[in-house]
Amino acid sequence: MGGMIYIFPPIFSFFVDNIHSKIMIMEKRSPLPPFTEETAKQKIQMAEDAWNSRDPERVSKAYTIDSEWRNRDRFINGRAEIVAFLTEKWAKEKNYKLKKEYWAHTDNRIAVRFEYEYQNADGQWFRAYGNENWEFDADGYMAKRYASINDVAIEEKERKFV
């Protein structure tokens, strides 16, 4: 019996990738909503640790496949755009160090205040101050992230996060 070789059109690959994405998103990402103050703080610490890794792939896994972001004046949709955005961000923001702080929460939302420090290509240090509003799906993935951020130039001796 001769073996048959099947050649699938590119559209098949699209469907396989989407099915794989849907299967991955079905995994739970604890802690899950509804949040308590304790579980909201756990979620915040997990986010801080991931962002301080400066690994765009690792960070992106905390978000839904179709996550919606506003970061300053940029609108970002989906994990692929998140990875591209973070790769670009951390290429410019050297020696990045972040600290997040619990502000408030409801059942599936968390509000965070944060500060981070970084150096630009010229060696100038900055401290960024901001607030984030997060909304999670039932599986514990962040579906929406809205961040307002302001930067202040600082001297190296003024750094908090050494």
Spans of model-derived segments:
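A beta-strand edge to alpha-helix "cap/lid" segment located at domain peripheries
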Residues: I25-F35, A84-V162
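A solvent-exposed, acidic/Ser-Thr-rich amphipathic alpha-helical stretch
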Residues: T39-Q42, P56-R109
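Short, Lys/Arg-enriched N-terminal segments with co-localized hydrophobic residues
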Residues: Y6-I25
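Residue-identity detector for glycine
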Residues: G2-G3
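Intrinsically disordered, low-complexity regulatory regions of eukaryotic regulatory proteins
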Residues: F14-F15, M46, G130
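Short, low-complexity N-terminal intrinsically disordered segments enriched in polar/charged residues
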Residues: H20-I65
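Residues at secondary-structure transition points
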Residues: F8-P9, S53, A84, F136
